[in-house]
Amino acid sequence: MTIATGAAVASNYYPQPLLDSIATDLGVSYAAVGIIVTVSQVGYGVGLMFLVPLGDKFEKRRLIVLMMALTAAGLLISGLAPSLPWLLLGTAMTGLFSAVTQVLVPFAALMAPVNAKGRAVGMLMSGLLIGILLGRTVSGGLSSLGSWRIVYFVAAAVLILLAVMLWRSLPTHRSETRIIYNELIGSVVRLFKTEPILRQRALLGFLSFVLFALFWTPLAFLLSQPPYQYSEAVIGLFGLAGIAGALAANWAGRMTDRGKNREATLISLVLLLVAWLPLGLGKTSLAALIIGVIVLDLAAQLLHVSNMGAVMRINPELRNRLNSGYMTVYFLGGASGSFAAATIYQYFGWDGIVTAGVLVALVGLVFGGRAVYRTRAGG
């Protein structure tokens, strides 16, 4: 399940090291090609809102395998795309059905013992982050063997293989919920009205993913220009610098199980601000850029798992819907950050990205610091 989670979410991040090549091949601007990242995040957010709650209604194994197969179909459309609109169509389809990751996470929590649910979530969150980061690395490496299109074809084949493996290995599980679909979706919206912890954690998740996307979306542009002028394969290797964040996922899961969620949240909010200090020097310093990547990814993952731990404890019977609500807002943050990053970099360069990052991180620290002490979010 961890591997499937990573492979599915990676589908949304393969384009990032390839943006410069895609822009050149399709004859579009940086701002236009940056829409690819935005569309993938919006598609993922729509899937989280309208598809993930189905895990509380339908048999989970069948739903997971179907969504994996449709994600692969979206990748094939992208790989065959003759123009940007076709690529955006394939990207939207991939993003929509790759939300299967958030059917897998509550399923893992459901199957885990009571005293190990935080670790189970942390394990799949590790797979999620590794997929996001290594997706860039694999993408850059594969593209060096040929066209950027080969990345999409290989990724589609991997997802089909994983879908077959999940069908053979996962247990069947049908929810006892008999609620109709419209009421199911409406209940997700109502949870935001009735659960203050969900509102607070969703906003923190939104801000953290804005920061994550602000950095990663324009990184390929920065590294493909002087003084770096790196190839796609080298740009993809920067995903390895963020692997430290995967370690934070297990650590955060264990802190949640020990009732230290609030401490993990505050540490992550401080680190999200601190990360932009070395990143501010990244325009000319490779060492500073790498340090900033490590701190930013670690902090973002630590906060994400802390948020998930708090949200999952609200009501065990509503895990899929709580997860759907939180993750929808979370990935809307990614879409907003991606859209803003492409535009900011186009007109203000790396200095504009860093300024925006510092401002968003300050908002998160002020809001989050007040919120976690006003509620017993993670206990």
What is each stretch, according to the model?
Residues 62-76, 263-278, 358:
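Structural signature of the two symmetry-related core transmembrane helices
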Residues 46-84:
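Conserved MFS/SLC helix-loop-helix module at the cytosolic interface between two early adjacent transmembrane helices
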Residues 86, 123-168:
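Helix-loop-helix hairpin linking two adjacent transmembrane segments in secondary transporters
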Residues 100-112, 302-315:
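Intracellular juxtamembrane helix-capping segments at the cytosolic ends
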Residues 48-59, 247-261, 345:
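Helix-to-loop junctions at the C-terminal end of transmembrane segments
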Residues 90-127:
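Cytoplasmic helix-loop-helix junction between adjacent transmembrane helices
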Residues 262-307:
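C-terminal transmembrane helical hairpin of 12-TM major facilitator-type secondary transporters
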Residues 171-203:
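Juxtamembrane intracellular "pre-TM" segments in multi-pass secondary transporters
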